[in-house]
Amino acid sequence: MRINKIFILVSLIIFSLNKISATAQAPDYLIIEKDTLKLHCNPLETYFEKNPLPDNTFTTISTGLWRGYIAYFKIKNNKLIVDNIYKIRYYKDEQGNHKEELISIYNIAFKEIKDFECNFYNGVLICPRGELIEYVHMGYSSVYENYSLFEIKDGNYIKERHLSNQEFIDLKLKHFQKYRESDEYKTKLAETVDMLKESEKDFEKDFKDIRKENNKKRKQNKYLYEKEKEIEYRKSAEGFLFFFTTNNIKTIDITN
């Protein structure tokens, strides 16, 4: 979705330059029996990349919901299905108070298909549980006490595991280290570095003090400045991909 590129550009500027706080994102949800669990992943994004929603679906976009929708999922008969999907209407009541209203867009997204099956999805549904240990005002980077993971292959439920926060971080790190060896990662890293460079150029146009400081460093030693910037871009891009990438976790277990 085009809006995701905007979100990435904004987040990259924030992540690398650390001038202002980024925005935590409203999650999708997984309904398991009587529990409604937050999801630290968005299973429908790959579907909407190939089957985009109509341009007029969203009239307003919040910085806390760049994708524009909130989806609710269930595992029914061992299949991952969409229970409902909503957009948020923002309005003021008669007293001038800001209000929000969930409006279903299920029929817009999936027409008359009931219990839309996510047979395109391969990955792990990441559900934080328990107390919030560390709040991070960026994407799904906050750390929780525990995590429930549900492995899905071709839309089918495979297995689940329940981990402490340290066990989850260790698992995520192992997956990321393996992901770094892939051609996909190298491509995404290069794309992220390019977007970071593009974003910083735009950022410099709007902030004269930053532009002056960078120009001063360029004049002092252009070669050293460019080398340092390349290292900075790469580190920022790698950090961004580690914190924001969850779709590289395809299985709960990982082999060495």
Locate the predicted segments by residue.
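Start-of-domain marker
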Residues: 21-82
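A short, sequence-level motif marking secondary-structure junctions
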Residues: 42-46, 88, 164-167
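An exposed acidic His-Trp-rich patch
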Residues: 81-156, 162-164, 175
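Short, basic/low-complexity N-terminal boundary segments at the transition from targeting/disordered tails
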Residues: 8, 14, 47-56, 127-130
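A cross-kingdom marker for long, charged
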Residues: 212-256
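A general structural signal for short secondary-structure junctions and capping/turn motifs
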Residues: 2, 72, 140-141
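Bacterial Sec-dependent N-terminal signal peptides
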Residues: 1-26
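Mixed-charge (acidic/basic) macromolecular-recognition segments
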Residues: 144-229
